[in-house]
Amino acid sequence: ITLIMVQSFFPLLPLKGKSDPTNRYYMYASLIEDIKTTVMNDVSNSGLRIVSNEFQIPSIINFYLNPKLEAICLSIDYHETLYSFHYNQDRLVGNDFIYIHDKKEFPEKIKPYFDSFEPVLISTKSRNNAVIANHSVWLVKNYKGKL
């Protein structure tokens, strides 16, 4: 445990990029700041629910930013999460969202679930001269629900 704590703040081991397990502490920092300044301060987007297709992103958004509408996981071709029980997918049909993905490109498997998707921003986090995380943020319109 001591080694992990030291590695988190004073990298001693020659680990770079995604091979460093302590990057998890840092990888969402840019995303949180970018969402706060770009999405939550934009009047046209601030009323939209933030969604993702993996549970970690909404959990991080809810913890650090506490949006008006709770960020949720849609669980499309993904295991059910706590959000699946709190938010009935049928009640979300027709809604527009801010969608966050953990890669730069919009995921192909998600495209059929929305009428359109527009890029809002790309958030990149580097540590020790290596990119450790890329997140893309999208405006998605007219959620079709589970297909």
Language-model region placement:
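Transmembrane alpha-helical segments
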Residues: I1-Y26
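A broad, low-specificity signal for short, low-complexity segments enriched in glycine/proline
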Residues: F9-L12, Q56-Y64, Y99-D102
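Generic signal for short, ordered secondary-structure residues
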Residues: P14, V39-N41, P119
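Short periplasmic/luminal acceptor-recognition loop of GT-C membrane glycosyltransferases, typified by
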Residues: P21-T81
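Aromatic/acidic, Gly/Pro-rich catalytic loop(s) in extracytoplasmic/lumenal soluble domains
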Residues: E80-L147
